[in-house]
């Protein structure tokens, strides 16, 4: 980065090209580099929210991948999601243009900063956003690179003026262990990305390295309600670790007196830090998002704020300023006095957390939970098939579509219909249905929605676009639907 800075100063700007620039991780880094003054461009297969946003800043976006897209570039940035046979990669190799992995570019941005890296199987994006809100409330102005759109900012990345950088650290391909972080957060560890790691123990080992690679003056923040994380923490003695939880009485930071509704969660916090005498109680902390899992995410942010002496007022103000993250239990519409929720949940543990939150709210409203789930990736379904069969218990009515491939080839016997058949055969759910076409979900909503119901549309594929288009789809059939802005 220092060499690039020198070239920038000397007015000899070189172009950095991002393949797959519309991806949430890639778009964030591209935006930060652009705001730092670098010349940035990129390509993606289709236009989306991220490409439109970047284009509005003046960043050149190519739709489609082609050799000519990198005619005048000096560096190419890729993520692990990019196929090695991509024509732009092949052209870069042919012309010996340096190809930089997304994680390596993120590491360069973090290298000269005091950095907070947030990792874990679930909750990374929300936790990153919450930490950022506390930094801002404390009078610091961090640079933030997130894995989702932060509603406060309408972007997933923004440049700050301080020496702090807060980033979501993607564990999918083990590159997160090379990120030069000062503070590391681990929200949880579940079997995920086993197509890369091959076995769970290797994945756990990567998280261990994530902690032990911290400098001696840094610290980790870990959720020990999760048994795998607890075991990991118990085995590490060479780094400072601050723990948090709801059920773990020995955690350093514990939430209690919990109340939650459709829009928020309120709780008290007990703080008993290592090597600090006495206990501190913070009463009535409120976060404007529901769910036990989000309370845990907020505890991670509190741990960072307490360790960095932000003060209780800044912590409370930071949470008050938090407006949520796009696609994390986002209410997008109302139909027949039922709430329609768009959620990114695509792993069994995420699904359980989302449906548990919905069930809690529906019970208070004398309603039911209607879950419409679009599976994501054949490989994930194959590795976690048994877990998927068991994760829908809190749905009163369940509909499962076919699998959103995300570029993968089909795997024999692994389909949305086969999942429904197994759930029904083994009596894990008595109202599980296969939805042949996502468009059929409109009829499901018309036929089933009643006052107080929670309609949860989940998945990492195109179900989000569908959920956000429901007003038009329902009105075209003569039904009134109120979109929530």
Curated annotation (Swiss-Prot):
Pathway: Cell wall biogenesis; peptidoglycan biosynthesis. SUPFAM superfamilies: MurCD N-terminal domain, MurD-like peptide ligases, catalytic domain, MurD-like peptide ligases, peptide-binding domain. It is found in: Cytoplasm. One of its GO terms (molecular function) is UDP-N-acetylmuramate-L-alanine ligase activity. InterPro entries: Mur-like_cat_sf, Mur_ligase_C, Mur_ligase_C_dom_sf, Mur_ligase_cen, Mur_ligase_N, MurCDEF_pg_biosynth, UDP-N-AcMur_Ala_ligase_MurC. Coiled coil: none annotated. ATP binds at residues 120-126. It holds the Pfam family Mur_ligase_C. The keyword Cell division applies. Gene3D superfamilies: Mur ligase, C-terminal domain, Mur-like, catalytic domain, NAD(P)-binding Rossmann-like Domain. GO terms for cellular component: cytoplasm. It catalyses: UDP-N-acetyl-alpha-D-muramate + L-alanine + ATP = UDP-N-acetyl-alpha-D-muramoyl-L-alanine + ADP + phosphate + H(+). Belongs to the MurCDEF family. Cell wall formation. This is UDP-N-acetylmuramate--L-alanine ligase.
């Amino acid at each position: 980065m220092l060499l690039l800075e020198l070239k920038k100063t000397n007015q000899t700007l070189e172009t950095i090209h991002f393949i797959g620039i519309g991806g949430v991780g890639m778009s964030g880094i591209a935006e930060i580099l652009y705001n730092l003054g670098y010349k940035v461009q990129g390509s993606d297969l289709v236009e989306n929210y991220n490409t439109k946003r970047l284009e509005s800043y003046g960043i050149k976006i190519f739709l489609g991948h082609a050799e000519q897209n990198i005619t005048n570039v000096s560096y190419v940035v890729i993520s692990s999601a990019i196929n090695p046979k991509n024509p732009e990669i092949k052209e870069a190799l042919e012309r010996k243009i340096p190809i930089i992995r997304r994680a390596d570019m993120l590491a360069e941005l973090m290298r000269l900063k005091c950095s907070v890296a947030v990792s874990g199987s679930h909750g990374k994006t929300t936790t990153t956003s919450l930490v950022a809100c506390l930094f801002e409330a404390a009078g610091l102005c961090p640079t933030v690179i997130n894995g989702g759109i932060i509603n406060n900012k309408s972007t997933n990345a923004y440049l700050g003026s301080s020496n702090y950088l807060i980033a979501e650290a993607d564990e999918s391909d083990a590159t997160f262990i090379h990120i030069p972080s000062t503070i590391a957060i681990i929200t949880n560890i579940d079997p995920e990305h086993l197509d890369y790691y091959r076995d769970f123990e290797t994945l756990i080992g990567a998280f261990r390295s994530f902690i032990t690679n911290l400098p001696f003056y840094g610290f980790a923040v870990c959720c020990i309600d999760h048994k795998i994380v607890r075991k990991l923490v118990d085995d590490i003695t060479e780094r400072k670790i601050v723990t948090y939880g709801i059920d773990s009485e020995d955690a350093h930071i514990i939430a209690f007196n919990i109340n939650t509704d459709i829009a928020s969660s309120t709780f008290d916090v007990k703080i008993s830090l290592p090597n600090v005498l006495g206990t501190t109680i913070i009463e009535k902390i409120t976060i404007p998002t529901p769910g036990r899992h989000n309370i845990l995410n907020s505890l991670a942010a509190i741990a960072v704020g307490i360790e960095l002496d932000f003060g209780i007022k800044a912590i409370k103000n930071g949470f008050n300023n938090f407006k949520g993250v796009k696609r994390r239990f986002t209410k997008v519409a109302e139909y027949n006095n039922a709430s329609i929720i768009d959620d990114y949940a695509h792993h069994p543990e995420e699904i359980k957390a989302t449906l548990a939150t919905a069930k809690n709210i529906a019970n208070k409203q004398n309603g039911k939970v209607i879950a419409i789930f679009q599976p994501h990736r054949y490989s994930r379904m194959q590795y976690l098939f048994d877990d998927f069969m068991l994760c829908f218990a809190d749905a009163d009515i369940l509909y499962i579509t076919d699998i959103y491939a995300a570029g993968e080839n089909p795997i024999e016997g692994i389909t949305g219909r086969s999942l429904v058949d197994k759930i029904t055969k083994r009596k894990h759910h008595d109202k599980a249905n296969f939805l042949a076409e996502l468009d059929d979900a409109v009829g499901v909503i018309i036929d089933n929605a009643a006052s107080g119901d929670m309609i949860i549309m989940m998945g990492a594929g195109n179900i989000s676009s569908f959920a956000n288009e429901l007003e038009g789809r329902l009105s075209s059939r003569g039904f009134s639907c109120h979109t929530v802005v």
